[in-house]
Design a protein with these regions (language model features):
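Active-site helix-to-loop segments that bind/position phosphate- or nucleotide-bearing substrates
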Residues: 2-13, 17, 25, 33, ...
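A positional/architectural concept
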Residues: 8, 17-43, 50-51
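Glycine/small-residue-rich interface belts in oligomeric ring/scaffold proteins
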Residues: 36-85
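A cross-taxon signal for low-complexity, glycine/charged-rich
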Residues: 167, 171-177
């Protein structure tokens, strides 16, 4: 199976496909890679010329082209035959509303649990953890939004503490409690800095999920929750939710190694770093697998749940002990 996630970031370049080779020409010269070894192509270049032959051959090989602005996807070019399993597509469309809601609830529960797990790792003394834990493990309405707000507050404080000029904070009382509520970080699709690092990481995650969906014949254009909000591949956005903390952890590690906010930019070095997270090994069920393998396992479970209308086959990923170790 194809496995390379190719990032195109040259300021000015030309992309084409000749003799089965993805070809990129830029001021640095010409680089080639067999298209059959490519899972997806992420284009963040400010000025890239894309030859029509690349679109044609990418479609034949099942390769998604993800075109970004400010390091977040704005266009997804998918193969026309993205779902060759007609029975599966019909089953997905015919899911009863109750089943769809249950599948989404399992997804949200896993995402919130994963955010809690990561927050406990990066900020074990943060006073806001208790409230996050109650919500993440509970059944509050709109728990996804509540957990997200709490998680990003904790994440923002934890990353700002990595800056050498940030005053030392204490977990309770005094300066620590005050500073913990005054993080300057806000998670948005814009904003630069950490947001750019996260956006690019999520684009890598999206491309990995898309590859697995194509592999099992699931049409990513039909989702279980994101359909009203996303215009392209809502199912990919749905199933990637529990894996977002994997990107968040990768970004946190980068910030730990590069504590000056001036270095929080999407550089070539960062791209190489973040695109490696699908190869990290984590626990899933009774196995230790690469994250990309876990994604495939989750997608296959979702496929079976859809075909047999039994939500028990869908088992979103939650981290085991030691997942967030350095």
């Amino acid at each position: 199976m194809s496995y390379h996630i190719v990032s195109i970031d040259a300021a000015n370049c030309s992309l084409s496909c000749r003799d089965g080779q993805l070809t990129c020409k830029s001021a640095e010269g010409e680089k080639k890679l067999p298209l059959e070894d490519v899972a997806s192509i992420i284009i963040t270049s400010w000025s890239a010329q894309i030859h029509s032959e690349l679109f044609l051959q990418a479609a034949k090989h099942g390769v998604a082209l993800i075109i970004c602005e400010a390091f977040k996807p704005v266009s997804l070019v998918l193969p026309a035959n993205r779902s060759t399993d007609t029975l599966l597509s019909r089953a997905l469309l015919a899911l009863p509303p109750r089943t769809t809601a249950q599948l989404w609830q399992k997804t949200v529960d896993a995402k919130c649990a994963n955010q809690l797990s990561l927050a406990e790792q990066i900020a074990p003394q943060d006073a806001r953890l208790a409230a996050l834990r109650t919500t993440a493990l509970g059944r509050k309405p709109h728990k996804e939004a509540i957990c997200a707000k709490a998680f990003w507050q904790i994440f923002g404080t934890a990353t700002e503490l990595k800056h050498p000029l940030t005053p030392a904070l204490t977990p309770d009382g005094g300066e620590g409690a005050s500073a913990a509520t005054e993080s300057t970080f806000t998670r948005t699709r814009e904003g630069g800095g950490l947001n750019d690092l996260l956006n690019y990481g999520y684009a890598v995650l999206l491309s990995t999920v898309l590859q697995k969906l194509f592999g099992v014949g699931l049409d990513p254009t039909w989702g279980i929750s994101h359909a009203p909000r996303e215009r392209a591949t809502p199912l990919a956005y749905d199933l990637m939710e529990p894996f977002r903390p994997c990107v968040d952890w990768r970004v946190f590690q980068w910030v730990t190694q590069h504590p000056d906010p001036k270095d929080w930019m999407v550089t070539k070095e960062y791209r190489r770093w973040v695109t490696g997270f699908p190869l990290e090994r984590v626990e899933y069920l009774e196995f230790t697998l690469e994250i990309q393998g876990v994604i495939e396992g989750v997608v296959r479970g979702f496929r079976r749940a859809v075909l047999e209308n039994k939500i028990g086959f869908y088992r979103p990923w939650t981290p085991g002990e030691g997942t967030w170790s350095a």
